């Protein structure tokens, strides 16, 4: 059985044509991307590395990693989003190899293949996030890096990420997130400990409404990032 929720896939497929519009529904991803890209590159030094972007959607992170010199493959189960990603890659001239395949399936096919594996803003949208973490651990080379980002599960995250972002500020379409699927850092750490990955750093992401920008912080109450390495 595929580790995906058909409703979640359809939700993002319906918006696929808007993926690269920086002022539409995916504006938060465009605004967030420089922060997460810089953080990933600071750890993994992307130039010349082979990278896999799991749950790549329309390719915002995939293209930006390729732009820094990585050889990037992006995977997703939304063929609509991948179609948009392919088209944008042609328009930008930045080469990314996209494929419609599940994380678990590519892990079985290509174990220990990638220097860098990213899984950003995806874990909270799948039924079994622990299985995705395990697939990431299988895919990365010994000594390689795996990066996750997701949403904490607490009252503050619900108020800001759901009520605030979706209903008040309308930064995201209503129904983008299911609070019950948010993941506490301790839970994600548990998934990681079940593999041969170890956590190197956990950082929060804070949104500054006055400047309308995201920044790294030590506040993991809402959005947070986790950098992991596989044992050599």
Swiss-Prot record:
Its EC number is 2.1.1.222, 2.1.1.64. The keyword Hydrolase does not apply. Keywords: Methyltransferase, S-adenosyl-L-methionine, Transferase, Ubiquinone biosynthesis. It comes from the Bacteria. This is Ubiquinone biosynthesis O-methyltransferase. Belongs to the methyltransferase superfamily. UbiG/COQ3 family. It catalyses: a 3-demethylubiquinol + S-adenosyl-L-methionine = a ubiquinol + S-adenosyl-L-homocysteine + H(+); a 3-(all-trans-polyprenyl)benzene-1,2-diol + S-adenosyl-L-methionine = a 2-methoxy-6-(all-trans-polyprenyl)phenol + S-adenosyl-L-homocysteine + H(+). It comes from Burkholderia lata (strain ATCC 17760 / DSM 23089 / LMG 22485 / NCIMB 9086 / R18194 / 383). S-adenosyl-L-methionine binds at residues 36, 55, 76, 120. One of its GO terms (molecular function) is 3-demethylubiquinol 3-O-methyltransferase activity. One of its GO terms (biological process) is methylation. Pfam families: Methyltransf_23 (PF13489). InterPro entries: SAM-dependent_MTases_sf, UbiG_MeTrfase. O-methyltransferase that catalyzes the 2 O-methylation steps in the ubiquinone biosynthetic pathway.
């Amino acid at each position: 059985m595929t580790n995906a929720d058909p409703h979640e896939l359809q939700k993002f497929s319906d918006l696929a044509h808007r993926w690269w519009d920086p002022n539409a529904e995916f504006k938060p991803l465009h605004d967030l991307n420089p922060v997460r890209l810089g953080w990933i590159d600071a750890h993994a030094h992307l130039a010349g590395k082979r990278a896999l972007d799991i749950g790549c959607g329309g390719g915002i992170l995939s293209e930006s990693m390729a732009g820094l010199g990585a050889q990037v493959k992006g995977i997703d189960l939304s063929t609509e989003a991948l179609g948009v990603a392919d088209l944008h890659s042609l328009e930008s001239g930045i080469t990314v190899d996209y494929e419609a395949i599940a994380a678990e399936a590519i892990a079985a096919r290509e174990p220990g293949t990638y220097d860098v594996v990213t899984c950003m803003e995806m874990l909270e949208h799948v039924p079994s996030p622990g299985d995705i973490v395990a697939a990431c651990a299988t895919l990365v080379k010994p000594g390689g890096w795996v990066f996750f980002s997701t949403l904490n599960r607490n009252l503050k995250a619900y108020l800001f990420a759901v009520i605030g972002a979706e209903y008040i500020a309308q930064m995201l379409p209503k129904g983008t997130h299911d609070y019950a699927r948010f993941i506490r850092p301790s839970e994600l750490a548990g998934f990681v400990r079940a593999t041969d990955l170890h956590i190197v750093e956990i950082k929060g992401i804070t949104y500054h409404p006055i400047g309308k920008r995201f920044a790294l912080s030590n506040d993991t109450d809402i959005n947070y990032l986790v950098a992991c390495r596989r044992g050599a």
